[in-house]
Amino acid sequence: MRLTILAVLLLALAACARGKPEPEKAHVDVSISELQFGPSTVLEQTWLLTLRIQNPNNYDIPADGMKYQIDVNGKFFARGVNNQSVMVPRLGEAMIQVQAVSDLPTLIQHFGDLRRLSQTGINYYMNGMLYSGEWRYPFEYSGAVTPVQ
């Protein structure tokens, strides 16, 4: 009898543990919806980003933080962290406002040759991690701003 009860309990626990897919198989899509220049000093620049977090999974994600880095034309540009909580509904999306920080040498490196950038355009890439308790959701996003001909 004890063996039967133990087997039933183990099966119930296994069923609960399989309620969500493994974090490596689950993912979120994060994209930059808006970018603004924020409060800055000569040595450090703050960028205000509005991020769109899309959840293609069949369960809600109670996100409680994220970290991210932005590269421009293949080189590091800015990074940020955020500990805001946001519920990303199953098969839905949420918007969140965050900050990223760059410094003067990085800014000079990227925008020192504005004439070249106005002809070639700007390619950007963002990667990071969305946190939900002990779960981690890596993300990547890239895009380009092409010059107007």
Model-flagged regions — what are they?
Residues 2-8:
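Sec-dependent signal peptide recognition
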Residues 12-15:
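C-terminal motif of bacterial Sec signal peptides marking the signal peptidase cleavage site
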Residues 17-20:
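Bacterial signal peptide processing site
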Residues 25-75, 132, 136-138:
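Post-signal-peptide N-terminal segment of Sec-exported extracytoplasmic proteins
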Residues 75-109:
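Intrinsically disordered, low-complexity Pro/Gly/Ser/Thr-rich segments with frequent PxxP/GP/PP motifs
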Residues 104-149:
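Terminal connector regions
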Residues 44-48, 93-97, 123-125, 140:
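Intrinsic-disorder/low-complexity, polar/charged segments enriched in Ser/Thr/Lys/Arg/Asp/Glu/Gln
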Residues 31-37, 80-84, 109-113:
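Short structured motifs
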